[in-house]
């Protein structure tokens, strides 16, 4: 794995298929369907516009021959425009930073956990030990409601936290992009554990009064890698609806993942998950290339769910008292290695190499292992480590806090490629590659790293 992974990072992984022969088995039927949709749309356009344009060309050639050449050039450019599929552009993104009164230090965490009366001495000591080794600093954010005596997970607390982080991220994004919500055609929202009725995506539509024909999707139960899945779904929808905007929102709700029992197998996630959310605005409008920050280059999804060990490595469980919590098996690191190896093999040849890497900031141990396995430099890991330290594990939105860090440090230059990697239950490893379309200046407003 190390040899293959290092090749990919430093110069790309060469395709293993025979030279010159397409790997038809690698194609998914959804792309065939999208191809048919694109072909039908293109045929309809040519049927409407080609005949009158040909008549115009014949008329000009006969009576105004001096204009024949520029008109021919125009026709060629027009045909090229319609025959070339539009790319998916990332206009901007925003990461929510909760208010300062929700900051929590490690000592505050332990003190509040003790005062809650929900944990015995063994549970307290375990959480203290995990916190000390977590890589999380003294300024991450947590809802205080989870430390209430006798606290049990409930929808009211979950909805309140969801509204805070989701609306906060979207408000900042809309202010930065200046896009009217009525122009948003597609909405994709992912949240792992909290799944409400009406859905969180419906909550967004109601709050912002989006159009009645908005293509809305709510992804749940897909873990920390669901942010990349949401981007993939939005990409396919943008290809089907050319010239549209897509809003993608990624979050996890801490007050709904919190475990208030004493089962030692369910306690560690308490020490890692922190509040956060990211909102991303995508576009398939060609004209938006000139104001977009990034262009989507490649996206690969890997699912190891066919293997029982992978499938059961992360799951939501209940203890004997009926309290739910997240279980993470001891095999998860090895499962993650195999998933990452498969993802890298599928990613194929990428040249030039990546200038920047954003690895899901789940824990210090995970980052250390990826650092070692892929033979990365400290600079490669800087964004992930700083994000874990400052914001903790914000789940699927973590990779966006990392990209925000790179922008804050003015590291994203025109032509740079950034590789975002997410891991999640199932077990899944998903990654996406973006290319910077311009030098990204440090944002003055919608960046969580601004003081």
UniProtKB/Swiss-Prot annotation:
Topology class, membrane: Multi-pass membrane protein
Domain FAE, residue spans: 82-366
Gene Ontology, cellular component aspect: membrane
Recorded superkingdom: Eukaryota
Localization of this protein: Membrane
EC number: 2.3.1.199
Annotated family: Belongs to the thiolase-like superfamily. Chalcone/stilbene synthases family.
Protein name: 3-ketoacyl-CoA synthase 15
């Amino acid at each position: 794995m190390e040899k293959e992974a290092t090749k990919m990072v430093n110069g790309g992984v060469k395709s293993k298929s025979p030279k010159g022969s397409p790997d038809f088995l690698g194609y998914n039927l959804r792309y065939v369907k999208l191809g048919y949709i694109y072909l039908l749309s293109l045929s309809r356009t040519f049927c409407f516009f080609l005949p009158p344009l040909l008549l115009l060309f014949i008329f000009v050639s006969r009576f105004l021959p001096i204009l024949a050449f520029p008109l021919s050039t125009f026709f060629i450019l027009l045909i090229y425009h319609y025959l070339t599929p539009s790319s998916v552009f990332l206009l901007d993104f925003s990461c929510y930073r909760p208010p300062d009164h929700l900051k929590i230090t490690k000592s505050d965490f332990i003190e509040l956990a003790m005062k809650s009366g929900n944990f015995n001495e063994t549970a307290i000591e375990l959480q203290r030990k995990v916190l000390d080794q977590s890589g999380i600093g003294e300024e991450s954010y947590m809802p205080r409601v989870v430390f209430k005596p006798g606290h049990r997970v409930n929808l009211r607390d979950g909805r309140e936290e969801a509204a805070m982080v989701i609306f906060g991220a979207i408000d900042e994004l809309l202010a930065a992009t200046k896009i009217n919500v009525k122009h948003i055609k597609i909405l994709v929202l992912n949240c792992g554990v909290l799944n409400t009725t009406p859905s969180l995506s419906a909550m967004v539509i109601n709050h912002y009064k989006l159009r009645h024909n908005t293509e809305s999707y709510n992804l749940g139960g897909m873990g920390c890698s669901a942010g990349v899945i949401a981007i993939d779904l939005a990409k396919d929808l943008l290809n089907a609806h050319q010239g549209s905007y897509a809003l993608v929102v990624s979050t996890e709700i801490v007050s709904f993942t919190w475990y208030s029992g004493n089962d030692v197998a369910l306690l560690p996630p308490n020490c890692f998950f922190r509040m956060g959310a990211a909102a991303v605005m995508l576009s398939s409008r060609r004209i938006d290339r000139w104001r977009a920050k990034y262009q989507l280059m490649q996206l690969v999804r890997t699912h190891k769910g066919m293997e029982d060990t992978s499938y059961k490595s992360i799951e939501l469980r209940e203890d004997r008292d009926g309290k739910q919590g997240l279980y993470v098996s001891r095999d998860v690191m090895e499962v993650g290695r195999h998933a990452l190896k498969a993802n890298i093999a599928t990613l194929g040849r990428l040249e030039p190499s990546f200038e920047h890497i954003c690895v899901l900031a789940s824990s210090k141990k995970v980052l250390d292992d990826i650092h070692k396995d892929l033979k990365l430099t400290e600079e490669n890991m800087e964004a992930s480590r700083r994000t874990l330290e400052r914001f903790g594990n914000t789940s699927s939105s973590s990779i966006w806090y990392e990209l925000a860090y790179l922008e804050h440090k003015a590291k994203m230059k025109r032509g740079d490629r950034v590789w975002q990697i997410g891991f999640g239950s199932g077990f899944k490893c998903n990654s996406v590659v973006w290319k910077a379309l311009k030098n990204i200046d440090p944002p003055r407003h919608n960046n969580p790293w601004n003081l």
